Amino acid sequence: MSLVTVGIGDLAVTGDPRAVIVTHGLGSCIALVAWDPGLRVGGMLHFQLPASALSPERALDAPGTFADTGIPLLFHRLYARGCRKEALVVKAAGGGSFNDRGGAFDIGRRNHAAMWRILRHARVAVVAEDVGGSRSRTVRLFLDSGRVTVQSGDQVAPL
C-alpha cells in the first residue's frame, strides 16, 4: 500500500492501484473525491474556502485552497490522465459547522454551496456525500476499488 496524503488546500491524482489517498482533519473544509473505475485513476481535493476572491494572490500560489479554483484543477488533472466526466464517480465529505454564529461565518455551509454550484455548472454528478454536522472527518480513497471511507473518531463508514 502506498499512502498519498492530501493536506489542506492540496490535491492529488494517481493511477497507482496500490495507493490510498487520504486527508485528515476535515472540519469546515471539504474533501472532493473522484474515481474513474475503467482507468482506475482517482483524485482528491481538500479545499478550505469557497471563493478565491477572498485572496487572489493565495489562489495563484495554492489554487486547491478554494472551491472555485481547486475543483476545476482537480478535474483538469483527472482529464489529463484520460478520465472522462461521465465515467467519474464523485463523492464529498466535510463541510461541518463548529460555531453558532451561522450566516457568513458558517464556512462549512458556504463551502458546500460553492461546491454544488461549481459541479452543477460543470454538469458533474455527486453520487454520495457526508457533509455538515460538527465532527471532524478523515477521508480515504482506495484506488484498487474506488472505495471511499469516512472516519470520525473510531467510527469508519463507507461513503
UniProtKB/Swiss-Prot annotation:
Keywords: Chemotaxis, Hydrolase
Protein family membership: Belongs to the CheD family.
SUPFAM superfamilies: CNF1/YfiH-like putative cysteine hydrolases
Protein known as: Probable chemoreceptor glutamine deamidase CheD 2
One Pfam family named in its UniProt record: CheD
Species: Anaeromyxobacter dehalogenans (strain 2CP-C)
Coiled-coil intervals: none
Catalytic reaction list: L-glutaminyl-[protein] + H2O = L-glutamyl-[protein] + NH4(+)
Top EC group: hydrolase
Keyword Metal-binding: no
A Gene Ontology molecular function term of the record: protein-glutamine glutaminase activity
Statement: the UniProt record of this protein carries the keyword Hydrolase: yes
Its EC number(s): 3.5.1.44
Matching PANTHER family: CHEMORECEPTOR GLUTAMINE DEAMIDASE CHED-RELATED
